[in-house]
Amino acid sequence: MAITAAMVKELRERTAAGMMDCKNALVEAEGDMELAIENMRKNGQAKAAKKAGNIAAEGAILIKTTDGLAALVEVNCQTDFVAKDDNFLGFANEVADAALASKVTIAELQAQFEEKRITLVTKIGENINIRRVEYVEGANLASYSHGATIGVVVAGEGDAESLKHIAMHVAASKPEFLTPDDVPADVVANEKRIQIEMAMNEGKPQEIAEKMVTGRMKKFTGEVSLTGQAFIMEPKKTVGVILTEKGITVSNFVRLEVGEGIEKKEEDFAAEVEAQIAAAKA
């Protein structure tokens, strides 16, 4: 498989490794991006292999709530200029309101608003996409929005302020699972295999490597789970400890971030302005 400059660029952005290291890793992996990252981790070259996708596309995360139900919707556009446009935000809010009212699937939501989307694309001159919708149910819901780029909803039992703080933590720390026990077996097995190979590459015998990995795996499952993470407001305590101390529980959470995993075509500011002027004249 031919290794393109775009592939090398993506791997550099995801790992912060050097250009030649990235190119060589892609050649070795025959163009398989995830395998290249895995191999680079083993070789100690990756600096950010945990990065959750390349944040590129623009748009907004909308959160709408009613009694016992919250809807989170991601609507994308091509530039941050349009992401702040009243027409775009009006459309995004209408989509989110419809999601909350009917609890429809993403396919149903896209179909429902396709005609309006096409009209907006024609008016604004950029591609608009209704990308994701997630729902959270619970008697007590806390939400947090970081601008319009990150949206979090937490379901649980406890006082509103504490649940809000947990939502803020989720926004900042990006947990993937609720507790260490919720980390899927295949994820744990894959990470354990990588850690053992890394330890053996350091010259450790397999028996010693496996013992070393036990501690590393506990750290890994803690870092990717909400209750195992250090609480951002009291870093010496885990979220799990904070929950116990405050007598609150969390049953579920959803975190959405604009453009997660979408590759964005890069344009300089002048080109972006020219594109907007051209669209306005069309």
Curated annotation (Swiss-Prot):
UniProt-listed Pfam families: EF_TS
Any single GO CC term annotated in Swiss-Prot or TrEMBL for this entry: cytoplasm
Keywords attached to this entry: Cytoplasm, Elongation factor, Protein biosynthesis
Major location category of this protein: cytoplasm
Name under which the protein is recorded: Elongation factor Ts
Highest rank taxon of the organism: Bacteria
Family: Belongs to the EF-Ts family.
Name of the coding gene: tsf
Function: Associates with the EF-Tu.GDP complex and induces the exchange of GDP to GTP. It remains bound to the aminoacyl-tRNA.EF-Tu.GTP complex up to the GTP hydrolysis stage on the ribosome.
Signal sequence annotation: none
Spans annotated as Involved in Mg(2+) ion dislocation from EF-Tu: 79-82
Cited Gene3D superfamilies: 1.10.286.20, DNA helicase RuvA subunit, C-terminal domain (1.10.8.10), Elongation factor Ts, dimerisation domain (3.30.479.20)
Protein localization: Cytoplasm
An example Gene Ontology molecular-function term: translation elongation factor activity
HAMAP family in the record: EF_Ts (MF_00050)
Lineage summary: Bacteria, Pseudomonadati, Pseudomonadota, Gammaproteobacteria, Alteromonadales
PROSITE patterns in the cross-refs: EF_TS_2
TM regions (residue ranges): none
CDD domains the record matches: UBA_EF-Ts
